[in-house]
UniProtKB/Swiss-Prot annotation:
<keyword id="KW-0119">Carbohydrate metabolism</keyword>
<keyword id="KW-0325">Glycoprotein</keyword>
<feature type="active site" description="Proton donor">
    <location>
        <position position="228"/>
    </location>
</feature>
<feature type="glycosylation site" description="N-linked (GlcNAc...) asparagine">
    <location>
        <position position="278"/>
    </location>
</feature>
<feature type="glycosylation site" description="N-linked (GlcNAc...) asparagine">
    <location>
        <position position="244"/>
    </location>
</feature>
<keyword id="KW-0961">Cell wall biogenesis/degradation</keyword>
<feature type="signal peptide">
    <location>
        <begin position="1"/>
        <end position="18"/>
    </location>
</feature>
<feature type="active site">
    <location>
        <position position="251"/>
    </location>
</feature>
<dbReference type="GO" id="GO:0071555">
    <property type="term" value="P:cell wall organization"/>
</dbReference>
<keyword id="KW-0378">Hydrolase</keyword>
<keyword id="KW-0624">Polysaccharide degradation</keyword>
<dbReference type="InterPro" id="IPR012334">
    <property type="entry name" value="Pectin_lyas_fold"/>
</dbReference>
<keyword id="KW-0964">Secreted</keyword>
<dbReference type="Pfam" id="PF00295">
    <property type="entry name" value="Glyco_hydro_28"/>
</dbReference>
<protein>
    <recommendedName>
        <fullName>Probable endo-xylogalacturonan hydrolase A</fullName>
        <ecNumber>3.2.1.-</ecNumber>
    </recommendedName>
</protein>
<feature type="repeat" description="PbH1 1">
    <location>
        <begin position="183"/>
        <end position="213"/>
    </location>
</feature>
<dbReference type="InterPro" id="IPR000743">
    <property type="entry name" value="Glyco_hydro_28"/>
</dbReference>
Length: 406
């Protein structure tokens, strides 16, 4: 018979044998390197390199790196879809050149589609990477046929943690970058964006950034040359910061347009340290009036700070009759709700187009116009600085003249 003491001693022996000795190997904590893929370029515009790139995304997209090497051209003859990317690092050091085919692109939404992706770095580490939308033929066709539907170069919808940096983007058929679909946490930094036509047909509708339904979007250190909005805060934009940006030839930093056919809201947007050159306006708000199928426009907590105005037609503009004529708006006045709109620290000189007027602030008579202006030191070439006002508050902060329109 085995005594209780014997059982206890045997148990201790078993425990001592089960316990690991100090000489045993510790668990491996070595960090495994990210998978890396370099797609093979076809070397000819007759070969579509999109399948090779998407195969690389499939192979290395889950936490890996895809490299477009320097001094190499990849010809993209179809839509590039980032499906399969999750925390992937897509490095463009060479050239991604899209086909100019107007037949192929007609009706397409995007040239580069980033849909519901969680974690993407689209960047050039060396600063040499270029994405060419090859949009000249699309601009020429649109000049002849305004029904021609052109794609956005980079279309981001849904997803989160998107970073785009260090790249040059050029000549999109339409908008450069669109962010919508409740995207969150998107950053765009150190970019050069230019749309330049070599014909008499302007690169119409080449907004640099259309920021729609999204939260926590940052745009910084970007140089833009285009023929439409520099940055447009579209319906649903919330917590968007734009800083250290220069725009040439654009329509400015714009809220809107809002309220065309639905109730639209933009809130918590901040634009700071902006240089606007030869643009139709440096900054402004565009809302449709009441009546018809138009909805209610609401803009809350929008700040425009430290703008340098160089040859822009207006330094600041509020349009409450956007998209309609004066006769319509007399019967259906603007009803937009503008709350917490701050304009401060504007300096520089406008163009001579509206001289002596430097700003045109036409708030809707049926709406709310909570706007304050301070440190506004913009002048027209003549040296005058006339500000046209309509339905603005008595504590606006600047001296007003009648005659506001738009």
């Amino acid at each position: 018979m085995i005594s209780l003491n014997s059982i206890f001693l045997l148990s201790l022996v078993g425990l001592s044998r089960a316990a690991p000795s100090r000489s045993e190997t510790s668990p491996d904590r070595t960090i495994k390197p990210r998978a890396a893929c370099t797609p093979t370029a076809g070397g000819s515009s007759s070969t579509d390199d999109v399948p090779a790139i998407q195969e690389a995304i499939t192979s290395c997209g889950d936490g890996g790196t895809i490299v477009i090497p320097a001094d190499t051209t990849y010809y993209l003859n179809s839509v590039l879809d980032f499906k399969g990317c999750s925390n992937c690092d897509f490095q463009v050091e060479g050239l991604l050149q899209f086909t100019s085919s107007t037949d192929y692109w007609n009706g397409k939404t995007a040239m580069i589609s980033v849909s519901d992706i969680d974690g993407l770095k689209l960047r050039s580490v060396t600063g040499s990477g270029v994405i060419d939308g090859n949009g000249q033929e699309s601009w020429d066709k649109f000049a002849e046929d305004s029904s021609y539907k052109r794609p956005t170069l980079l279309y981001i919808t849904g997803g989160s943690n998107i970073e785009v940096s260090g790249l040059r983007q050029k000549n999109p058929p339409n908008v450069f970058i669109s962010v919508k679909g409740d995207t969150s946490n998107a950053q765009f930094t150190s970019l050069t964006m230019d749309a330049t036509s070599n014909s008499d047909n302007l690169p119409k509708n080449t907004d640099a950034f259309d920021i729609g339904a999204s939260t926590y979007v940052t745009i910084s250190s970007v140089a833009i040359t285009n023929d439409d909005d520099c940055v447009a805060f579209k319906p649903g934009a919330n917590y968007v910061t734009v800083e250290n940006v220069s725009c040439t030839g654009s329509h400015g930093i714009s809220v809107g347009s809002l309220g065309k056919s639905s109730d639209d809201t933009v809130q918590n947007v901040y634009a700071r340290n902006i240089t606007m050159i030869n643009s139709s306006k440096a900054a402004g708000i565009k809302t449709y009036p009441s009546g018809g199928d138009h909805g209610l426009s609401t803009v809350k907590n929008a700040t425009f700070e430290d703008f340098i105005v160089d040859g822009c037609d207006y330094a600041f503009q509020i349009q409450s009759c956007y998209g309609e004529d004066d006769t319509y708006c007399e019967e259906n006045p603007g009803d937009a709700v503008l709350e917490g709109i701050v304009v401060k620290g504007f300096t520089g000189t406008t163009s001579d187009k509206e001289d002596p007027v430097v700003a045109n602030l036409n708030c809707g008579s049926k709406g709310t116009c909570d706007v304050t202006i301070s440190g506004f030191e913009v002048k027209a070439p003549s040296g005058d600085a006339k500000i046209l006002c309509g339905n603005t508050p008595s504590d606006l902060g600047v001296t007003c003249s009648s005659g506001a329109s738009g």
